Each structure stands twice: as C-alpha cells, then as structure tokens.
Amino acid sequence: MTLRMNDFAARIGLLLIILVAAVVGLRSQQSQGSAFLDFVSRRVEPASSKHTFGKFCPVDQSRFARKIFIEYGAMFVASSDVQLPTSCYFADEAALLKFQSTLKTSSTTLDGVEIRLQAPAMASFLKVLDAARQLNVSISPLDGSIAAARSYSDSVSIWNSRFQPALVFWASQRKIPQDDVDQMASMPLPKKVEKVIDWETGGLLFGTGRRRSIFSSTAPPGTSQHLSLIAFDIAGKVTPLITALFNANGWFQTVSGDPDHFTYLGVFEGELPKRGLKQI
C-alpha cells in the first residue's frame, strides 16, 4: 500500500512512503502520511528549535536517509518521556556515544545477561516480564545483551554478518561485478546502502540466508533503534499472547519482516493512529 503525502510531504520531497508497525500481532502501517510526518516534525523539531526537518533526516536529498526513515522511523512517534536523537541516524561512534551519555538508563538481568534500556522503557519492560511470569510465559533475549542496548561497533558487526556473505555469494554467481565489490571497502556508508537498495530492488537479497531483505534482518550501522535503547528482540516464537503483553505496555513491532523486534513507543494502542500508524 502506498500513501500520497500532503503539502508537507511535498515540501520535503517525500511523495510516497510506507512505514510499518504492528498492533496486537498485526502488521501496521501509516494511516495518513501527513499525520505521521507532521507528528514526527513536531516531535523532533519543537517551535523553539532552529533545526529543520531536512537537517534531522534529509529524505529529500538522500535515498539512504529516506530508506532508513521508512524502515525504522516509527520510533520517532514515541511518547515525550522517551529521549530521541536529533538525527535519524548516527554518523559514527562518537555521535552515538555523545547521545547515549545523555540518557537516563536502567538495567536488569534476564537469562543471565544484562538488559539495558532507557529508564521509561525499562519500567515498562519489567511490567511485561512480571505479567509474563504470572501467566507462565517465557520471554528471552535474542543473542544475549544485544537484544536491547547496542554499541556502534555492534551495529557494524551485525550488518557485516549479513552483508559480507551475501556480497561474496552474489559476486560468485556473477550477479555483482567484481569492480563493485572492490569499491565497497572505501565507499561511504550511505552510498554503500544505496547500492544495496539497488541490488535488492533487482532481486539480489542480502538478508539472512538471502531469503529476505537485509533491512528487515538488521539495520545499517548507526541506524538501529537499539542504539537509542528503546528496542528489544525476543528469542523463539512470538505468540499472540506475548505480542499482547508487550502492546499493553507500550511496546510494538515496528520493523517490516522482523516480528521478533519490539520498539518502546510508550503510548496506548488507540493513540497510534493519531501519530500516523494503523493496523494492516
């Protein structure tokens, strides 16, 4: 489903957008592109701010920025108690460390590993765990502590664990010229991601096992919601009951094709349409 934007969207050059989220186990999508964009604009650019939306996320100038905003931008409709970055991605480790140093965080131990989140997200997460225990439902972190907070190097490692094997495979199948492979090492991340967008559009998938898009398997370095400490990945099958427990406490599945991934938005389900999200 594609959505036409209003004048606001035209102003930033984004004419079509698909943004997915999940509510009560169903895929969710922007109900009104204008509602989503307008809300995000107000959320990240208050009246007193001198920053423009383009500085926050240059979707009109960069296919990289447009892609990550579409894939992971649902986090920017989070409640006001969630601290959000001033850019839709972190350009490097220094930028991420500066942001993370300003966060009020809290930790707990789950299955023997530390789970660290922004304090409001953790308070809600503990309610989810408590409700799950009362119902004898098991919730475990996927891949240890990186199920929650991540460092910049974590995001690089996870991306490369999908990207590099797929690149080698498609090159071996002569689907990607060796010259393109050689250029990858020195290519800036945004341009590298744009090449992946082109390859996947042509049917060369880079996700796990090359069965799905890499963008539903992992986010490019510096773009993951985990870097803002408001995401959690669940190991094992995500049942409707588990989804309902998370949804009831302000957590929703917001990344297309990644049902294990929950994002803390900190709002009730009924509030989501007002922020530009709806069930699909």
Question: Predicted segment positions?
Answer:
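Extracytoplasmic cell-surface/polysaccharide-interacting catalytic and binding patches
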Residues: R4-I280
